[in-house]
């Protein structure tokens, strides 16, 4: 053994061969190591390829799912846009109705104010008419009192006339009695044919006749004067009575007209109050409707704000860029 070793050491060929053999062994070991490493790398590449294939499949699945989600989101977005448009149309309609209701309410308030003014003017007119009616009633009462006094005066004149007629009748009765006495005395004188008595009677008869005639003339004059006064008073009374009757008739007609006006004004006042109550109720209902519309509009605005906040996430440029980059990366992986 030592001899062979020494031979190898002495022989350069053997030495070179030995070195080449060792180098070959080292190369074989290094090649085996490289082969092992290559196999390891190949296995790793296979695993990475399988992982890439799986990731590509997952990416494709994700892309498909994202496309479906984006399609659904676009569909929901279109539906939300349609809902928002419908809500805008409804809002415009509500706003228009609200403007109409406000205009109607303003017209109602104007009508109520005009009705209140007309009612106030009707009240003042009623007060004026009542005052005039009271004054006319007072003047009518005064005229009635005056007519009553004139009637009493006329009745007193009639009583006085009746008393004077009765006194005239008594005077005529006395005159007839005196004439009867005279006639009886004359007949007695004729029967007795007493000339002295006849002469005395002839002397006394003219005196008595003259006195009686004077008395009768005075009474007749007084009766004529009383009759003239009675005629004048009767004519004046008839004139006053006719004038008062005309005034009473005019007053009654005016009173009837005033009563009609008062009734008409009361009716207008009742109608005005009824219309005012109706307008107040309409105003209250309009206020309630306006409040409900405001609440509905506020709720719709809040709902639209919530939806817009949810939709703004999809409308943001950063989110769009991230989605675009993700899709590009997935497409690049799928191409590999």
UniProtKB/Swiss-Prot annotation:
GO cellular component assignments: nuclear envelope; nuclear inner membrane; nucleoplasm
InterPro entries found in the cross-reference section: NEAP1-4
Summary of the knockout phenotype: Double mutants NEAP1-NEAP3 display reduced primary root growth, and altered nuclear morphology and chromatin structure.
Motif annotated as Bipartite nuclear localization signal, chain positions: 240-261
Topological type in the membrane: Single-pass membrane protein
Keywords: Coiled coil, Membrane, Nucleus, Transmembrane, Transmembrane helix
Compartments, as annotated in UniProt: Nucleus inner membrane; Nucleus, Nucleoplasm
Transmembrane stretches, start-end: 313-330
Signal peptide: none
Superkingdom, taxonomy of origin: Eukaryota
Coiled coil: 14-87, 128-261
Subunit structure: Forms homomers and heteromers with NEAP1 and NEAP2. Interacts with SUN1 and SUN2.
Protein name: Nuclear envelope-associated protein 3
The species this protein was found in: Arabidopsis thaliana (Mouse-ear cress)
Gene name for this UniProt entry: NEAP3
């Amino acid at each position: 053994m030592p001899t062979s070793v020494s031979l190898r050491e002495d022989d350069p060929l053997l030495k070179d061969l030995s070195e080449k053999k060792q180098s070959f062994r080292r190369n074989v070991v290094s090649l085996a190591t490289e082969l092992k490493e290559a196999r390891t790398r190949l296995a790793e590449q296979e695993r990475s390829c399988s992982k890439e294939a799986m990731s590509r499949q997952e990416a494709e699945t994700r892309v498909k799912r994202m496309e479906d989600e984006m399609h659904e989101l676009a569909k929901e977005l279109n539906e939300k846009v349609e809902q928002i448009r419908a809500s805008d149309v409804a809002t415009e309609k509500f706003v228009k109705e609200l403007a109409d209701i406000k205009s109607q309410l303003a017209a109602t308030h104007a009508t109520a104010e005009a009705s209140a003014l007309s009612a106030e003017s009707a009240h003042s007119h009623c007060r004026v008419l009542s005052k005039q009616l009271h004054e006319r009633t007072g003047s009518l009462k005064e005229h009635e009192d005056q007519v009553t006094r004139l009637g009493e005066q006329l009745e007193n004149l009639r009583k006085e006339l009746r008393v004077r007629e009765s006194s005239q009748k008594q005077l005529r009765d006395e005159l007839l009695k005196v004439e009867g006495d005279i006639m009886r005395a004359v007949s007695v004188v004729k029967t007795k044919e007493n000339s002295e008595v006849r002469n005395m009677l002839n002397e006394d008869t003219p005196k008595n006749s003259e006195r009686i005639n004077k008395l009768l003339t005075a009474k007749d004059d007084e009766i004529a004067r009383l009759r003239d006064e009675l005629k004048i008073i009767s004519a004046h009374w008839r004139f006053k009575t006719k004038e008062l009757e005309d005034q009473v008739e005019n007053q009654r007609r005016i009173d009837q007209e005033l009563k009609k006006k008062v009734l008409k004004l009361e009716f207008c006042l009742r109608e005005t109050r009824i219309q005012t109550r109706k307008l107040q109720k309409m105003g209250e209902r309009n206020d309630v409707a306006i409040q409900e519309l405001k609440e509905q509009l506020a709720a719709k605005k809040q709902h639209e704000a919530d939806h817009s906040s949810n939709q703004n996430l999809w409308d943001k440029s950063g989110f769009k860029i991230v989605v675009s980059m993700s899709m590009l990366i997935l497409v690049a992986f799928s191409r590999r």
